[in-house]
């Protein structure tokens, strides 16, 4: 996802992910930090759980930018309604033939948005109830490990590695590498699609 998301505007199909795990499993400190380091700050929209579909849509406009939405918890009816809107946006963004959103305005003139984002949701409880969303969103569950000296040492090693990569401006370097290999990426995507079709039907 980190490799593909910066090029979401070039893709015919844009998958999304939902990072989940119980409290203290390390969603923010590991996976979301890996996204920040791997893509580089400023190369994606970073939003919190109070974000609405309208807010994200207006922030995206016609720009092909990935979005990370942390704390996407479906705790209340209001939360679930808000997530329904965000999931509709993500669903429509998955394929180019569904990517045009037309909204009415108070002035009486329609406003058009071409939604070409790839979303990463993160929460303790994933909220994927529609079959259409299940085929578009991969759920990545983080297993919480017991607090031992070994696991604490591992976590500190991960943090040091992230810091070292960040100092090297790894996100920009990685994106530049992917740009230089776009023909290979496009060829590999076709292979992956064919292989996935054989497995998933």
What are these regions (language model features)?
Residues 1-57, 61:
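P-loop NTPase catalytic core of nucleic-acid-dependent motor ATPases
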Residues 2, 34-35, 70, 120, ...:
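Conserved RecA-like P-loop NTPase ATPase core
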Residues 14-18, 66, 118:
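Residue-level preference for the first positions of well-ordered beta-strands
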Residues 30-34, 85-93, 116, 132-136:
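Alpha-helical scaffold elements adjacent to nucleotide-binding pockets in ATP/GTP-utilizing enzyme cores
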Residues 55-106:
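Conserved nucleotide-sensing/catalytic segment adjacent to the nucleotide-binding pocket
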Residues 111-115, 130-201:
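Phosphate-sensing "switch" segment of ASCE/P-loop ATPases
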Residues 123-128:
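Short, polar loop motifs at secondary-structure junctions
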């Amino acid at each position: 996802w980190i490799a593909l998301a910066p090029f979401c505007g070039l893709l015919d199909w844009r998958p999304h992910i939902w990072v989940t795990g119980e409290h203290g499993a390390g969603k923010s400190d590991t996976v979301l930090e890996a996204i920040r380091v791997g893509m580089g700050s400023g190369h994606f929209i970073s939003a919190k759980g109070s974000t609405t579909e309208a807010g994200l849509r207006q922030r995206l406009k016609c720009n092909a930018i990935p979005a990370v939405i942390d704390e996407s918890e479906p705790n209340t009816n209001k939360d679930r309604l808000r997530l329904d809107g965000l999931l509709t946006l993500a669903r429509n963004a998955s394929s180019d033939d569904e990517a045009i959103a037309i909204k009415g305005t108070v002035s009486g003139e329609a406003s058009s948005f071409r939604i070409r984002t790839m979303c990463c949701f993160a929460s303790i409880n994933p909220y994927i109830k529609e079959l259409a969303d299940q085929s578009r969103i991969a759920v990545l569950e983080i297993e919480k490990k017991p607090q031992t000296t070994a696991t604490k040492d591992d976590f500190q090693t991960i943090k040091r590695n992230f810091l070292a990569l960040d100092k090297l401006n790894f996100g920009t370097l990685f994106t530049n590498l992917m740009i230089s290999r776009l023909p290979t990426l496009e060829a590999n995507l076709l292979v992956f699609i064919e292989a996935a079709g054989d497995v998933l039907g």
